[in-house]
């Protein structure tokens, strides 16, 4: 894992969140994974996926394969489906933009 002091910015839609990685640049949040852990992907470069754990001293990044990232995003879609059509629609759009 690589650790650094990251910065996150929440957008007007709950799905829009970004981090700045010191090597790979801007990352965007693809899906929440667990409490304090989210799935992020590179915004500009070749598609690289990270499990990011936010901590008081910064963030730690774990690179994961595409299929693992897709699995986490699909689990998030299933959770969002139970929360209602509006939330599911937002996450579905982000899923489609990322994986399809």
What are these regions (language model features)?
Residues 1-65:
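Long, non-catalytic architectural segments outside compact domain cores
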Residues 62-100:
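Short, compact, well-ordered microdomains
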């Amino acid at each position: 894992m690589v650790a650094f002091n990251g910065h996150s910015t929440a957008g007007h839609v709950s799905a829009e969140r970004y981090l700045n990685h010191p090597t790979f640049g801007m990352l965007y949040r693809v899906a929440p994974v667990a409490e304090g852990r989210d799935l992020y992907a590179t915004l500009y470069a070749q598609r690289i996926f990270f499990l990011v754990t936010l901590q008081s001293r910064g963030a730690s990044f774990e690179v994961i394969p595409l299929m693992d990232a897709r699995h986490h995003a699909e689990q998030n879609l299933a959770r969002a489906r139970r929360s209602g059509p509006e939330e599911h629609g937002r996450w579905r759009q982000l899923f489609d933009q990322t994986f399809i």
